[in-house]
Amino acid sequence: ETAEILYIPGWWRNGPHDDLLTIIGGIFPGTSPRLYRWDNLHSWKQSVKNADAVSVRLAEELAAMPEAQRNRIILIGHSLGGRICVRTLARLGERKLRIRQAILLAAAIPDDDPDIPKSFRGTAAPILNLCNPYDVTLKYGYGSFGEQMRPPLGINGCRDRHPLCFDIPVPDTITACTNLSDRNRLMNLNAVKRVANHHARFYLEYLRQQIGNDFAADAPLMVPQDKVNLEFPVMDRKLFWTE
């Protein structure tokens, strides 16, 4: 059966999203992805509250669908849109309802949020969590000022490995081979793209490239982030501590 795809944008990203919807349609041939709008044109603090509120509404909308239709739904959420996906799936899981799948792009939700493990029960296929340890916005914006300086899922990936959540680390090199804009040449300068690497286009482009391939082939080393963006040191596998 053909999937029904809803794309949920992040903060201050309410459209148009024709370019992103086209990319998503290319990843899932035969589908017509739709934009799921929500009230995100506010301050960050208010938009976080709105994201949590709209997740309840979306869960109710999905729960009210005929089961056959709900089983075709794929949610794709970027940044706060990823947060909405997690909260929505958690509410569905509590009611023993499921959609087909969810794809998280740079999800702006703490990596220790209790709704994350609950969300695994809300999909039939594993959740794909595209994360980037080098995401500038998440690392220096969200990680430093958002929600008690707790590191986000979009940087660290899932803390507890689970067969229904597949972390896909996006390499920092994706910015070099992806155009950020089809119209503005300035936006395609490498310096601009590296700073703007939170943009959904980079995450979707990597997903498109890797569909059907080995996601781990060029994946970066995932280094968990601590509070205030202090990275845990990486110990060489040949080095052992002895008493």
Which residue ranges define each predicted feature?
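Serine-dependent carboxylesterase/thioesterase catalytic core
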Residues: 3-159, 221-223, 228, 232-242
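C-terminal catalytic-base region of ester-bond hydrolases, centering on the histidine
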Residues: 138-243
